[in-house]
């Protein structure tokens, strides 16, 4: 379901932030323990739900608390950990069994409106990441490694990343190279009528699942927007608060949702779904999931960023990234209805979304910060994206932090995104019956998006408040931030994101 979250919500990108390389933050050494506590609320609504074939509710609500801790080990090394939850309710995914299910977790009515199935309408995604970084002052370089894990009822993910950074002798320029891998394990949960073997016109696989090896692909956009850490505040403009564009397909604020140290991701995974599902849904629902097949998605990304200070007022960076995905790139419970001449939905030809089992994404980004005056900064960002699904996209963002007083900054922002549709996308009921690949997921459609909002940060030089813990240590409440954003897509999807963050050291 993270995919649903990421793609609809996550308005993330994100946000892959895999594509997060665009928002890379330079490795630095801390001299105190630093703790970030963040809470994000996200809601969206629209009428192009992929679960119901591209026509139907996209309503979703998400609550996401997160805590990150960075601990200096010595003068050159830092250890960090991030722990978070994403609890969401989704009217869209509640329709997985819209026309009948054979799971023991629910009893179906002949009338869809009378069904009370919570198979996927509510879930909690849990995630954890650990990172270690080390500075090497003798050669002006640094290295960091990160491991992440996340799980929700149908997906379990493991993620690893390594970053190498080299600074010039004067510290004015830097080169950063990052490589990462995601391994996502999916439960193949198909729509109820397909599990029953009805209306597919294609036979079924095991247990009535429409599962020939090609069926498990995935428009995996979600994946990308699943970067381990979504940067909500984007106040450090080395970062990109919306991973969404990387996968341009997901330009929602998913990306305003999750935060973690560097990467936000669609980490939802696990083979032992059976056991964990007990915790989520109780023995009855866990038993319902035990019969499902599983499939795996592998995502590899490599990125490089070069940047530095051009003069006393301007600094800039350029980032290039390549992402390669293999395995299940479709979402099994996404329906696709075909152009078969039948008007009554219950009798239309329906299949599970089918996409190629590999995908290559390429992106190039440019970022610049111009210090107009002592109280005004202009931050500009542009990204170009293309993939072999036929999508081409461009994103532009501007943010203007304004210092209003001692430690108080107001930063309005605006982001525009446009993309072409995937070769495999058609709207509800528009696919030809002989199509090899097909999806009605509007994250892969042609659209434009507008995202706008405002952030406020209070960060006095000496902190908001502080007190002595002992002779050597002092607790300091360093900063408090608030961020509000609105997102609108030309297809009708709208979203709101509210984020609160505070930072303290000791």
Residue ranges and their predicted role:
Residues 59-65, 122-128, 156-160, 296-302, ...:
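Residues that define the transmembrane beta-barrel architecture of outer-membrane proteins
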Residues 39-45, 85-89, 147-153, 166-168, ...:
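Transmembrane beta-strands of outer-membrane beta-barrel pores
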Residues 41-64:
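Surface-exposed strand-loop-strand hairpins of Gram-negative outer-membrane beta-barrel proteins
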Residues 67-71, 130-134, 162-166, 302-308, ...:
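Residues on the lipid-exposed face of transmembrane beta-strands in outer-membrane beta-barrel proteins
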Residues 105-116, 323, 329-358, 363-367, ...:
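Outer membrane beta-barrel transmembrane domains
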Residues 48-51, 56, 84-128, 171-217, ...:
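Outer-membrane beta-barrel translocator/channel fold
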Residues 35-37, 81, 143-145, 175-179, ...:
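Membrane-embedded beta-strand positions of outer-membrane beta-barrel proteins
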Residues 74-76, 137-139, 169-171, 309-313, ...:
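Outer-membrane beta-barrel channels and translocator barrels
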């Amino acid at each position: 379901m993270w995919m649903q979250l990421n793609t609809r919500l996550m308005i993330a990108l994100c946000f892959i932030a895999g594509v997060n390389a665009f928002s890379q933050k330079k490795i630095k050494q801390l001299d105190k323990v630093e703790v970030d506590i963040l809470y994000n609320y996200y809601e969206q609504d629209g009428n192009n739900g992929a679960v119901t074939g591209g026509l139907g509710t996209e309503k979703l609500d998400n609550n996401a608390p997160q805590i990150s801790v960075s601990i200096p080990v010595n003068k050159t090394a830092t250890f960090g950990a991030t722990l978070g939850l994403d609890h969401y309710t989704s009217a869209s995914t509640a329709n997985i069994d819209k026309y009948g299910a054979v799971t023991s977790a629910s009893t179906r009515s002949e009338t869809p409106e009378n069904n009370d199935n919570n198979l996927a309408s509510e879930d909690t995604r849990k995630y954890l990441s650990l990172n270690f970084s080390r500075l090497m002052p003798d050669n002006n370089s640094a290295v960091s490694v990160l491991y992440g894990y996340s799980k929700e009822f149908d997906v379990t993910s493991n993620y690893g990343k390594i970053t190498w950074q080299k600074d010039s002798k004067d510290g004015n320029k830097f080169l950063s190279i990052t490589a990462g891998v995601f391994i996502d394990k999916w439960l193949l949960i198909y729509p109820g009528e397909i599990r029953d073997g009805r209306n597919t016109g294609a036979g079924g696989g095991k247990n009535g699942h429409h599962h020939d090896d090609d069926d498990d692909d995935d428009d995996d956009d979600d994946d990308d927007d699943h970067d381990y850490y979504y940067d909500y505040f984007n106040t450090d403009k080395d970062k990109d608060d919306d991973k969404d564009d990387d996968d341009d397909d997901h330009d929602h604020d998913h990306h305003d949702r999750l935060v973690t140290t560097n990467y936000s991701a669609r980490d939802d995974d696990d083979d032992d779904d059976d056991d964990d599902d007990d915790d989520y849904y109780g023995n009855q629902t866990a038993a319902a999931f035990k019969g499902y097949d599983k499939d795996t998605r592998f995502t590899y990304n490599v990125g490089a960023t070069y940047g530095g200070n051009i003069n006393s007022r301007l600094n800039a960076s350029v980032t290039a990234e390549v992402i390669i995905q293999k395995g299940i790139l479709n979402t099994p419970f996404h329906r696709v209805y075909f152009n078969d001449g039948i008007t009554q939905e219950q009798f239309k030809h329906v299949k599970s979304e089918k996409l190629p089992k590999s995908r290559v994404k390429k992106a190039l980004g440019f970022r610049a910060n111009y210090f107009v005056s002592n109280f005004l900064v202009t931050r500009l960002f542009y990204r170009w994206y293309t993939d072999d699904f036929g999508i081409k996209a461009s994103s532009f963002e501007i943010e203007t932090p304004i210092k209003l007083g001692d430690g108080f900054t107001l930063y309005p922002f605006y982001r525009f995104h446009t993309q072409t549709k995937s070769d495999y996308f058609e709207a509800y009921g528009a696919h030809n019956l002989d199509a090899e690949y097909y999806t009605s997921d509007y994250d892969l459609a042609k659209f434009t998006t507008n995202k706008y909002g405002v952030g406020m940060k209070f960060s006095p030089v000496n902190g908001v408040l502080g007190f002595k813990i002992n002779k050597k240590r002092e607790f300091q409440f360093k900063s408090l931030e608030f961020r509000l954003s609105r997102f609108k897509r030309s297809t009708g999807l709208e979203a709101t994101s509210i984020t609160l963050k505070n930072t303290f050291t000791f």
